[in-house]
Amino acid sequence: MADISTTQAWQDLTDHYSNFQATTLRELFKEENRAEKYTFSAAGLHVDLSKNLLDDATLTKLLALTEESGLRERIDAMFAGEHLNNTEDRAVLHTALRLPAEADLSVDGQDVAADVHEVLGRMRDFATALRSGNWLGYTGHTIKKIVNIGIGGSDLGPAMATKALRAYATAGISAEFVSNVDPADLVSVLEDLDAESTLFVVASKTFTTQETLSNARAARAWLVEKLGEEAVAKHFVAVSTNAEKVAEFGIDTDNMFGFWDWVGGRYSVDSAVGLSLMAVIGPRDFMRFLGGFHAMDEHFRTTKFEENVPILMALLGVWYSDFYGAETHAVLPYSEDLSRFAAYLQQLTMESNGKSVHRDGSPVSTGTGEIYWGEPGTNGQHAFFQLIHQGTRLVPADFIGFARPKQDLPAGERTMHDLLMSNFFAQTKVLAFGKNAEEIAAEGVAPELVNHKVMPGNRPTTTILAEELTPSILGALIALYEHIVMVQGVIWDINSFDQWGVELGKQQANDLAPAVSGEEDVDSGDSSTDSLIKWYRANR
């Protein structure tokens, strides 16, 4: 496709921005039905886009980008299993991980739905055995603790989801997650473990990932010291496709759960990578989790673009980053259970769309890839909201909240959850409408303080509400952002499904390891790195 910035649709949007940029949300909200017009439903989510900087003309011109970029055709191609990942010649089929068993999808001659449900069936049997006490450790003890060892998509997804759905952990099994090659990560987990009731899940597609295998070998040594070599087979399982390496490690390949090249790591929480999650919340709720994904997939696939929530949110991201110059995007869940959601989205969005060349290798001419970050409310209000409210940088933000908490406590005449949500609604209101100098002066504020207290408003937010944080709703939330990523990648004409920027650092680390450990002389090829390694060796 042509560079999107050279199209008439992009030029029309550029001209529109010149005329629209001074428009305020106060002005836009003079339209009586604005909130109703820009509120949508998708897979159990209630999504209010009305506090964004757009009007009908903006939306029409943003939607024109989808025509220019061939978005409809690319969506259909993704769901059909065409090789959208052109640099690795792979299908992009994370949506197949949540297809119903009766679905009909074959790719490259393989019945994908049948393959997915065969693995799900094995996962279900294994999780059921753990939860019922039929799977026992080497000494006959039931498993009470699972330690998931992985990194990137093999850690961030299941760790986030397990915390988010902790209210559904009803079988007495809990999970810890180890990812960092910093030994403090594993050591801090092992300190509190009972080897006899612990199961390690080693998640690595190739079973060669440096950080994961380093942690797995250290965990294996710890277990062997406690229980002996023969215990390994009853206390380790693998999420991998490399049967040879798994067997060499001492894991019975009958306890190896695979996934496929068409699943990227950051899109894999609903694959076998979610084994730890399934063991903690149970197969029934895991299937509800998948159902939420599928509901959002169907909304994305079938809903007309002007009412399609992932598409609209993706277009707003392009609007802010490429026209308003916003560089970051805050995700602010007013839910402690979603405290790891922003970290999860960082990999999903930034590893996907942090690209500087088009699919054909030519340089991009627009901005790409928003920087995602965030913390749960109300903590963020007492940390970084000051900058969002009164700073010089535009930070579009997504607020995520729920009508009903899993637990609640009294707070005077109200409840703590009502207090939480009062803050939630207040923040989006103040960010949108602020308070001007005239209004502040009318309150009797000293003249020299008026400008300090002005709240400019006009800070765009999207509000996402659901009745309750359930497995289904979490699945829908994740799929929402997955599809936002895909749409933006299509608009920018980049490959959202590779990650070559991760590889060179891995290679360099392997090359430097002998010098860092003292096995070889220091000669990295640049004086800075050489001097830093020499300092490290002299002071360790």
Swiss-Prot record:
| EC top class named in words | isomerase
Q: What is its EC number?
A: 5.3.1.9
The record lists the organism as Corynebacterium glutamicum (strain R)
Catalytic function, reaction form: alpha-D-glucose 6-phosphate = beta-D-fructose 6-phosphate
Instruction: Specify where it is mainly localized.
Output: cytoplasm
According to UniProt, this protein's pathway is: Carbohydrate biosynthesis; gluconeogenesis; Carbohydrate degradation; glycolysis; D-glyceraldehyde 3-phosphate and glycerone phosphate from D-glucose: step 2/4
Write down the HAMAP family for this protein, in alphabetical order.
G6P_isomerase (MF_00473)
Query: Any idea what this protein is called?
Result: Glucose-6-phosphate isomerase
